[in-house]
Amino acid sequence: MSIINSIDCHVIGIYFYNVILEKNLIIWQLNIITCSSHESTFCFVVDLLTAEDRDSILRVCSDQPTPQHHGVSLMTWELKLRMSQPILQTCMNNIRKPITILMSTDKVALEARPVLEKEACSGRYLKGAYLYSQCSQILASVPKLTLENNVQQWYPYLLNNSTIEDLEIHIKCSEGLYTCSSNSEPPLKKTQHLKIEDVFKIVDHSFLVAKTNIHIRTVIPIFHLLWVNVECKWNGCLPEFFRALHSKVYREFTGIAPIFTYLFPGGCPEATPFDIYFCGFPFVNLNCGKPEKILLCDLPRLHCPQILLSIPGNHADDLLCQPRDIPLPSIPKIWPINGIDINSKFCLEETSEIAFLNFKHIIVEVDFLCTICYIMGCKSDEIYNIMKFGSNNLNSTLQTWYNWFISTIFKWATQRSFNWTAMTQFKVYLSAVYASEIPKVSYKLVKDYE
């Protein structure tokens, strides 16, 4: 393979393409936007499978597709390789920053590294589209034995054994409107009608790896983000639509076709806070909800495999957060994060959950949620996912920082004649005797580490 000049780009999607067992190869597809021309393109990451990887995938159980899940065992197998692959790690750790990809002329990535001297492509909005789906969903009858012996499983049983009829799909983008229906309808006006090939452009590509010529076919959406209506989580429309698209694109293709796997909330053993996930095909960033304007430099953790953390035994801390490189303080872990505590000096009874202040006072509320989220490298609404789905090491780090903040706040309060009164999760309430003139105090709680 001859090497061309390196490309500075933003990675907006990482997708598992397939494995070639006879050659011990695994293939991923990267969707990228170049920094120089803002062109949307793609490249591939190809790696060798170890003997252990090969043996483990041969043990992966195949399952029958349902409206809520298909190929979960394969996705969890791929997740472990994804999280340890060096090029993909660089991409995931720099999701909001440009990276340099060194690639061959046939679009195989050889190396990836952060771009230190270049800022993100600020001011560039990602191109979005909106998919609306609806259908008639016929839920399955739940066997009496399931209702009696496993009450929590009756709702997933309804969803996973449901059937759909009268499927309608509408995709609206700047180029026009694509629509399809399982019922015959009069065609739309030509000025607004798009064909499916106009929305998902078919691209054939070949590359040479390990003296093997590999022929693949991918689809490139004409947008970067595809928003879908929330009902898609439960109505089973997306798997049916994309399964039909996969069949249409690859039915007569003789090369290596991509895998088609997915997991929806109804396919998880328990309730999950995470969004729908297609591991590979259709190679598009899917997100539930109303369309939003997303800057390229503000690309959130969209369409990543977080929902796989809801499958027992899966841990991938990098999917939950990216803690900043700050030395971890040495401090005993006294206070649990989920605890609610009242200072006994302000309790009428030992078991009281109410603080009584029978004097004229002032109250100071210290909320350090945003600060601890900054240190942990996550959003404020993601901190609870760390507590539930994170590894023991990650939760230990979170608890250490939590206790450091509590002790620092207590020290700060004592130096200024405040009493700690109560605490609940990431808030501490301080009180002091009211004075007509309140002295000015410094509210800096976090020191800089040398």
Curated annotation (Swiss-Prot):
One of its GO terms (biological process) is viral genome replication. Pfam families: Herpes_HEPA (PF03324). InterPro entries: HSV_HEPA. Belongs to the herpesviridae BBLF2 family. This is Uncharacterized gene 40 protein. It comes from Saimiriine herpesvirus 2 (strain 11) (SaHV-2). The gene is 40.
